């Protein structure tokens, strides 16, 4: 979990994803997540996906209890809301629904130490694990109070997009994979995941605007990787 004493106290995440074809993207997300709560917006139990115009910027905002207080604390820690990092904070605008659950999101950063300083030092997330990948790359696993934030960090990420993808949790990946295929979404076969006790499949639809994974965890463990 995140540091409960941290005055920022990040929890859920709100993702603004630019897409080229709003109609096709809306259809794909309706199949994947169900009916939107408003035009182009889907609410999960621990996050929100908002479709944006193709020329809009990607937005990543972590949910906090008090946005003004969190912004003031972030500024005190040296992170300006108008700085180069396109990550911010927002308040929860509606009750959390019973619905889809985010397992984790994937972000990238050009430098391991700077990533730790940003997510742990400034946003107050708990760094749970560091996994070397070779070639000066590492996976950093942070926790908020409601989800895992995976950051792939190293020099090779300098030219990569900040947002690397999203993973949705499912209780029955075989049934979910079959449902998506029957509904017309290009979805891979189910395979064993990297984390012990997990099985995954990839939803290979570019109209989703980001790499998308389904993950089944059995049993659920505290290991964030």
Where do the PLM segments sit?
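Core segments of cupin and vicinal oxygen chelate
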Residues: 1-49, 53, 72, 77, ...
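Vicinal oxygen chelate
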Residues: 1-9, 17, 68-104, 134-150, ...
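Short hydrophobic/aromatic beta-strand micro-patches
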Residues: 18, 61-65, 108, 167-169
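Eukaryotic phosphotyrosine signaling hubs
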Residues: 12-13, 56-60, 163-164
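Intrinsically disordered, low-complexity segments enriched in Gly and acidic/Ser/Thr residues
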Residues: 143-145, 149-183
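Short proline/glycine-enriched turn/loop motifs at strand-loop junctions of beta-rich domains
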Residues: 22, 67, 170-174
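A short, sequence-level motif marking secondary-structure junctions
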Residues: 53-56, 154-158, 217-220
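DNA polymerase sliding clamps and clamp-related checkpoint/processivity subunits
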Residues: 47-56, 60, 64, 83, ...
């Amino acid at each position: 979990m995140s540091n409960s004493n941290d005055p920022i106290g990040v929890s859920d995440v709100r993702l603004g994803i630019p897409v080229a074809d709003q109609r096709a993207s809306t259809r794909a997300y309706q199949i994947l997540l169900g009916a939107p709560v408003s035009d182009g917006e889907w609410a999960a139990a621990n996050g929100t996906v908002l479709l944006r115009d193709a020329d809009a910027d990607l937005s990543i905002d972590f949910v906090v209890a008090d946005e003004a207080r969190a912004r003031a604390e972030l500024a005190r820690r040296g992170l300006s809301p108008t700085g180069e990092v396109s990550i911010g904070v927002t308040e929860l605008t509606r009750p959390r629904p019973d619905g889809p659950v985010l397992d984790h999101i994937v972000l990238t950063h050009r430098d391991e130490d700077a990533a730790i300083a940003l997510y742990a030092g400034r946003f107050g997330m708990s760094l749970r694990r560091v996994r070397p990948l070779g070639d000066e790359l590492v996976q950093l696993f942070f926790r908020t109070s409601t989800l895992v934030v995976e950051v792939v960090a190293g020099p090779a990420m300098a030219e990569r997009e900040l947002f690397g993808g999203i993973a949705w949790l499912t209780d029955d990946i075989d049934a979910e994979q079959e449902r998506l295929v029957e509904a017309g979404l290009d979805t891979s076969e189910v395979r064993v995941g990297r984390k012990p006790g997990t099985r995954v499949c990839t939803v290979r639809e570019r109209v989703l605007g980001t790499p998308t994974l389904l993950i089944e965890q059995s049993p659920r463990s505290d290991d964030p990787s």
